[in-house]
């Protein structure tokens, strides 16, 4: 099968203002267009597997720190941070203050946001997905994948 890989992430990135890495509302807009110019069954959706930690107040040109999703959850737990969920972007986030008193915001993927992205594959009839940074795959991704789809090939 020959397919095109659609990178459905990096709206929020190292040098961007704080925001969801992979907002479902924006992914939908791209997919709505993509399926008008090519068969949905030829589209693989690229999937992010990391988080960003931005220092606040954010200043143009400052870099966010990259974390794994598991690392983001560990950080939230260590700081007793309340994990919140943006229902428009379908993304998890939290605020915390570091040991130096500096405020931060972290956007990451949790089981809810992963499920929301995986549902798009079936909803749009896509060929499947590819996962960026699969070498540090967070276990809930596997569990959700196996509960929702039949995995045919892992490369």
List where the protein language model places each region.
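Substrate-binding surface in catalytic domains of secreted glycosidases
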Residues: 1-75
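Active-site-proximal helices and loops of the catalytic beta/alpha 8
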Residues: 5, 136-155
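Glycan-binding loop/region signatures in secreted carbohydrate-active enzymes
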Residues: 42-120, 146-155
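Conserved, well-ordered alpha-helix/loop/beta-strand core segments that scaffold catalytic motifs
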Residues: 117-130
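C-terminal functional modules
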Residues: 132-134
